[in-house]
Structures are given as C-alpha cells and as structure tokens.
From Swiss-Prot:
Critical regulator of angiogenesis and endothelial cell (EC) migration. Promotes the migration of endothelial cells, which is essential for angiogenesis. May be involved in actin-dependent nuclear movement. May be involved in the organization of the nuclear envelope. May recruit Ran GTPase to the nuclear periphery. One of its GO terms (molecular function) is actin filament binding. Keywords: Angiogenesis, Glycoprotein, Membrane, Nucleus, Transmembrane, Transmembrane helix. Residues 469-525 are annotated as: Disordered. This is Transmembrane protein 201. The keyword Nucleus applies. GO terms for cellular component: nuclear inner membrane; nuclear membrane. GO terms for biological process: angiogenesis; nuclear migration along microtubule; positive regulation of endothelial cell migration. It is found in: Nucleus inner membrane. Residues 502-515 have a biased composition (Low complexity). Belongs to the TMEM201 family. Disruption phenotype: Knockout leads to defective intersegmental vessel (ISV) development, with a higher percentage of embryos exhibiting impaired vessel formation and incomplete extension of ISVs. The chain crosses the membrane at residues 210-230, 297-317, 322-342, 353-373, 626-646.
Amino acid sequence: MEALNQILIEYPPLVVGGVGATAVAAGGALIYRIATRKKPTHLQVNCWFCNQDTVVPYGNRNCWDCPYCEQYNGFQENGDYNKPIPAQYMEHLNHGVSAGVPETPKTLQWVNCQMLLCKKCNNNQTLKIKQLASFIPREDENYDEEIEVYKHHLEQTYKLCRPCQTAVEYYIKHQNRQLRALLFNHQLRRTRDADKAFIKNTYSLSTPAWLILLRILTFLACAFLVAVALSGYVDESPSVTQTLSGGVVPPKRVLQNENESKTDEGSLMWDDLMGLLPEKAVENARLFWQSGSDHQMAVASVGLLTCITGVLMAGPVRLRRIDAVASVLWLLVICFYLAECYLKTDVPSWLEMVKFGITSVCCLVGFAAAVATRKSTSQRRARGRRYLSGGSPGEFFCNHGPLLSAPVSESSTFIPTPPPNLSQLLIRQQSQRTRKASPSSLPGRLNRALSLGTIPSLARADSGFLFSGSRPSSQCKDSPPSDYYSLKSGSRPSSPGPSPTPSVAGSVTSTSSSARQRRPLISPARLNISGQKLRLFSSPLEPFSLASPPPFLSEHNPMHSRGFLPDVPHFHLQNHGSVIDEGSVFEHLEKPMGSSSSSSNCHVDTTTGNNIESKPGWKGFLGMTLWPGLLFASLTINLSFICIYVYYNWR
C-alpha cells in the first residue's frame, strides 16, 4: 500500500488516467447495452371480432387466429384480409354449429302481442335479403356500383307500410336510448380501468440491485470525505484552545479544562471500543483511513464517477431530480478540491468552511438518493370539477362516473326491451295522413353504422323501409318499380315521379374513379359508433310535444335525466338541458372503445393498440428538458476540468 501511495504521489497523471479509463469503460458498457437490446418475443393483441386480448409471438402480430372466436386476424391497409381464405366462398369447408333454441324472454313480447312488422312487410324483407345475397353482377369490375343500384331497386320494390314504418322508427329510437346508456357505462368503465393501469405501470418500476449498490457507494465516498474533514477539525481544536489559553481571562481556562476532561472521557471510550476489535482489523482500518486522508482528491473523483455512472446506467425512465442535484453537488466538491490542489499551502479558512458545507449537503443528498429507491404507489385523490360545455367530457366522466351509470345489466349480452305505448302510437300514426320528411332519418344512419360489409354511400333515408337511400312513399306511390339496369345506365324513369336520391346517383359516378376490386358481399361486419362521421346521434336538442305529434317521430331526442331508463311512458313538454350534448362524447373522445369501433378505412393493426395522444403541459416539458440538461452540463464541466488538469500536469 505504501509503494502504491508513493507511485501515486510521484505520478499524479496515473490517477487522472485511471479515472478516464473508468469513464471510457462505463461509456462502452452503456453503448453495448443499448446496442444489444433484445426485441420483445411476444406481444399482446386484440381481436377485431370479439374484442378479446391474447398474447401471440412478435412475428405473428398481424397474422394470428383468435382462441376465443376462432377468427383470423390479419389485414391489409385497405381493410381486406392479407391472405386468401377459401372458407369464405367454398361451402364444403364450413362446418355447422348447432345450439339449443333459447326461450324468448318476456321483455321481447310487445304490448299488443304482435310482431314488430306485419306479415306482408316481414315477407318482403326476407325476399329482399335473399335477392340481395344471390346477386350476380354483369361485370365483375363494376361490382360495387351494380350492388348499390340493385339495392336501391329492391328498396323501392319492397317498401314498408305506414304503420310498420312508424313502429320501426319508434323501436329504433327506443333501442338507441338503451344502447347509448350501455355505451356510456362501458366507456366509463374502460376509462377507469385505463387510469388504474396507467398509474400502476407508472409507479411500479423496480430499481435494480446494482443501481442501489452504486448509490450506496456514492454515499459512502461522500461520508468518508465528511469524516476526514471532521477529524481534521478535531485535531486542530486543541491547538486553537492552547493559543487562546494565553489570554488574560481566567474563566476560559476553566472551560478548556472541562472540555479537555470530556475529550479524555470520549477518547477512553473509543480506545475501549477499539480494544474489542482484532488488532489486524484495526491496523487495516487505520491504514485505509490514512491512505484515504492523503488522497482525498481520488476519493472525490471516484464518488463523482460512481454517481454519474449510476445515473447513466439507470436510463431516462429512472432519472430523478435528486440524482441530478447529487451530480451537481459532486461537481462542486471536485472544484473545491482542485482549488486546494492549486493553492496547496495558502488555503483560506473560508474556503475550508464552504468545502465542508458543500460536502455535508452532498452527503445528505446521497443518503436520500440511496434510501429512496421506490416511488409512492398511492393514487392521487380525484378532484371534483364542474363540466363546461366547451370542455372534454372524458375528464368529467372519469371523476363523476357513478353519477351517470346506466341502469343496464353488467352482462355482455344486450337484450332490448320493448318500447312503451307502442299500440297507442300505432293508432295515432294511422289516423295521420301527412308526413313530415326529416333531413336525416335515424334508420339510414343506423344502416350506415351497422352494416354487413360495404358501408353504403347513401346520405338520406326518407322512405318507409329499413334500407336507406329511397324516395318518400308519398312521392313514389304512382311511380312503377324501376329497373335497376336503367338506373345504372343513368336514364330517368318514364313516369313523372321524382328522380333517385342524389346520393345514389352520385355513388355511381363517384365510385367509378376509385380502385375497382372484387370483394365478397358479406365481409366482416363493422360497428361504427363515432358520431362525427356517420352522425349516428344527433346533437341539437328539440322539444317534443304530445299535443300535435307528427306522423313520424322526430329524429332529435331530448336527452334529459330519464333518458337512460328502459321504460319511458311519455315525453315531457319542456326542453330539458342535458348534462352532455348528444353525440359530443363520441365526437370528442379520440380513443377507440374497442376493435369493433373502427371502420374499414383504418390502418392495419389499429385494433391491437390504444393510442392516447395528449399534449404535455409546460410543467411536463420543463421536467423533461431541465433535469437532463442540468445533468449534461454537469458532465460536460466535469470532463472539461479533467482535461485541464491532465493538460497542466503532463505539460
């Protein structure tokens, strides 16, 4: 050990060279760890059909079979499958599924104990579906255009009668309220689960053992420097008191004698304690103490290097403010020791005091950094806020979820309940002879949202049948059924009836320029509930009057406090201001509620992740830039001082 101390005294550049070599080794280890980072072997994905999560290999993230519904999940950018599936067009490859017929619940029995549609309309709907399923186009390249025109032709041929149209619209409006309550409850539950998962993932980061060991070594190095400084003050205190004893005031000699007696008692206790230890251990401890006292600059350099290595190896995920503060304090300690090395004998007393204070603070910060290895797992208490009309409703629902819970069952299956007063509504609607055409009917919007395969481009549904895009029944009463090939060619019907709706005529010309690709009639079903695109839920609120009811129900429902109940006997005359505007929840919430909430034009693998984009505030930006910048500045200044020291010693 003495030979090593002699070599270090004669060749001080070796200390700096060792520090530089250690820094290079730590940087190389960090670069090697980043370069050899392994990719994930497995990935959690979400089924597009049943909305169930499962774990698949990373290479099969876009081509896998769901273990729950046995459906293949692998899509291209245009929404089609990324491989051919023969079972879609070959009947012998499909296997039948048999199940017992469930008993019809009592809630599905109507008030008048009859079906929703009459016998004639029910048969017409069956014929319409069969003819649409057996459609064969003239040209395969124009399949989309021909199926649109043929669907329009069937809708004009098989129309609903006036009472059935009234019953269907009333039932759809009632079911719309039930589904809206169910979707609200589902969205609130998913938001709460996502918040809990985010808090759990944020605060459950474990600290490695080697990182804790580096922080402990940093604290021990600083504690050793503080102990050496305190021992130096204790050794100098008798001489100071001896110079003061030459004064004239006698009481000071008495105080000095008392202090000397206390010091003697403390030294005796320390000697007794040291006598209990083995002599070899005491000798090694004294040798270590003497070596550290003679090379305090090396100890401080080791402490700084250990602190910076721990910060760099921890990574940006575990970067804390206390680590940045500790690195800055270590830099100040190194600066004071460098100043002492240059001043050598002419060291002022104030510099010693400042150095001791900085070293003590650095020791306390290092102890706090070594002890505080984990963050608190307690969740912050949610603060109640008042909802404003211009704000985002997602935050309001997160804090006030129980107040707006829908009174529907928590089961996954949804059983619609019959609308109230259906028989009275039918009698009232049969007595009316005028019909008010609504600008955008709800069946058309539901048909665009709940569709088997291709979403039609029809924007209006003013007639009395389930499919959208036809003329009102009052205007088409005298016109004969038109041939769908004449509609395809663009010719007008011979009768003086009105022309087809602009959406149908526009669909023939607008889709001709698009990419014509043959695709099956029944493609994977889509449920689009984003109110912004399809306008499934109307936003304006209009009062509903029972004194003069229109022949068909208005499309705008007043969303008041009783709108969530399954049975509503009558509507109030007042226009109640709802807690939220209809459709605003689905327009402002950018996060999809599940895989089935995405339309066909979504990109591939959009159903396997929930991306939440949020704009960080100025506090988050300050926290992300200030502390890494402070750490970088500390490291840069430290390397600059080391380079200057090496230059002046080797020159």
